[in-house]
Regions:
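Structured mid-to-C-terminal alpha-helical surface segments
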Residues: 1-47, 56-65, 69-274
Length: 274
């Protein structure tokens, strides 16, 4: 059996166990191999993890699938040259996993969000398998109070782990809730709702610190006044037929969300921000 076939067999087994598409497992495995190298590099403290990859690490891949990686830079300029140089250095670190990384393009992020950054494309190569990876890099986020060092378990062997700097859970939730309030009924990202719900209902967190982080995030993003009328915003979100429909589609798409009703999510968010 070739190395590629052997890896695919291991991935299929885990995909079956966790009820997750095999492509998601493959993508996350390749991200893991990159992050293991980051953990061994001089840039360990300079790339702070956030977003879906961090949520998946906290609640488990079987409770949150993700296909991308989000980071915030600390003590490193947010320029294509600095990002490329750092990533080339990280990818050059040798490991016994036989994965090779090819650094690709760095382009400005032009998403519908209010803060910028860059998207870096890489290819992860293992035998005949080539997996494209996308990493979003931003800077200047309000992390309240500070990043925390977090232990990430490896996909194929949860006795093996690596440590990286990441957002504290209160800041993760604050960014999600600020986005929900800011976008209101125009939100097109059901994962914002899911992430807020799953973190608030399964993890321990400091509610006062969450509130402080929410205020700091809104101040940083310039949305303090925009999200000030929380009762009206939440009433509109609760009554939005479009958001109900969007959530129902998400539930059908992901097994881990199928038993969560939209009204439960709204109740959890209301409880967070009351």
């Amino acid at each position: 059996m070739s190395r590629a076939m052997s890896l695919k067999a291991k991935i299929r087994n885990i995909a079956k166990q966790k009820n997750i598409p095999a492509q998601v497992i493959l993508q996350n495995y390749m991200f893991e191999r990159l992050l293991v190298r980051l953990a061994e590099s001089e840039y360990k403290k300079k790339f702070v993890l956030k977003g879906g990859m961090l949520v998946a690490a906290i609640v488990g891949l079987d409770n949150r699938a993700t296909m991308d990686l989000d980071t915030t830079l600390k003590s490193l300029p947010l320029t294509p040259e600095a990002i490329t140089g750092a990533m080339q250095s990280i990818c050059a670190i040798e490991s016994d996993d036989d994965v090779a990384f090819e650094v690709g393009t760095v382009t400005p992020i032009r998403d519908d969000d209010i803060y910028g950054g860059y998207r870096m494309m890489l290819n992860a190569k293992y035998d005949t398998i080539v997996t494209p990876l996308s990493i979003d890099v931003s800077t200047g986020d309000a992390i309240t109070p500070n990043p925390v060092e977090y232990t990430f378990s490896e996909i194929f062997d949860d006795k093996k782990s690596y440590r990286l700097w990441a957002y504290n859970i209160e800041t993760v939730m604050a960014e999600k809730v600020e986005t929900i309030l800011r976008r209101g009924v125009f939100n097109t990202r059901p994962r914002d709702f899911y992430d807020t719900y799953i973190l608030a209902t399964t993890q321990e967190f400091d509610k006062a610190l969450f509130t402080e982080a929410l205020m700091a995030t809104a101040a940083h993003r310039g949305t303090t006044e925009q999200i000030a009328d929380i009762p009206t915003i939440m009433k509109n979100i609760e009554e939005s037929a479009e958001l109900h429909t969007m959530w129902d589609k998400y539930r059908k798409q992901f097994a881990y969300a199928e038993k969560i009703d939209y009204t439960q999510i709204v109740a959890v968010i209301n409880n967070l921000i009351e």
